[in-house]
Amino acid sequence: MAETEALSKLREDFRMQNKSVFILGASGETGRVLLKEILEQGLFSKVTLIGRRKLTFDEEAYKNVNQEVVDFEKLDDYASAFQGHDVGFCCLGTTRVKAGAEGFVRVDRDYVLKSAELAKAGGCKHFNLLSSKGADKSSNFLYLQVKGEVEAKVEELKFDRYSVFRPGVLLCDRQESRPGEWLVRKFFGSLPESWASGYSVPVVTVVRAMLNNMVRPRDKQMELLENKAIHDLGKVHGSLKP
């Protein structure tokens, strides 16, 4: 109870600062849930989506969401889209199966890094990166290697605050079907929570951990949250809607 009350106070203090935020990857499952939670909590005075296409929303809550459509192959031409945001969330990502090896590297490393560079130049103070459990630039696995590489490259940009989230298998009802994901989610979803939490995590828990972490003051410039820390922080709901 004391923890949720403290979190509610932190949220209220954060709201009073009238900060602005951008989200990269709002069309994906994590980005979509993140946007929903941000709007429900009313944490920012301005919310901007940066993506390759404009998204359509029917709900009234989304009417004031700003959208910047960019060409990720020519991001330097869209530097203005990254200007004036206090906080940034990057949920960009694809798979090797969908985009091929070169396409995967281009999206998950090159697009992310260039976006971070433009955000830093545009005045962003706190950059949040959705990475992956096991990310390691020295890994022999391309997926984990690329995730580790971009983590390190973004850290070199020296944001005032840089938060990296490394969730395990994301449990969600993904709109876009990816080969094998349904079976994996079904497997982890059927396991006892105490065991599954080491290897998987619901998307909504990741999102809540991101936002709960954001409103808490930190002295460290860089912070890394592994799957267990994401579980623990994401379970503190405070005044969040169920």
From Swiss-Prot:
Single GO cellular component term: cytoplasm
Signal peptide feature range: none
Cell compartments where the protein resides: Cytoplasm
Keywords: Acetylation, Cytoplasm, Disulfide bond, NADP, Translation regulation, Tumor suppressor
Residue numbers binding NADPH: S27, G28, E29, T30, R52, R53, L92, G93, Y143, K147, L170, R178
Domain of life from the UniProt record: Eukaryota
Function noted in UniProt: Represses translation by preventing reactivation of elongation factor eEF1A. May also inhibit nuclear import by competing with nuclear import substrates for binding to a subset of nuclear transport receptors. Has additionally been proposed to act as a redox sensor involved in cellular oxidative stress surveillance.
PANTHER family according to UniProt: OXIDOREDUCTASE HTATIP2 (PTHR14097:SF7)
Protein name: Protein HTATIP2
Annotated organism of origin: Pongo pygmaeus (Bornean orangutan)
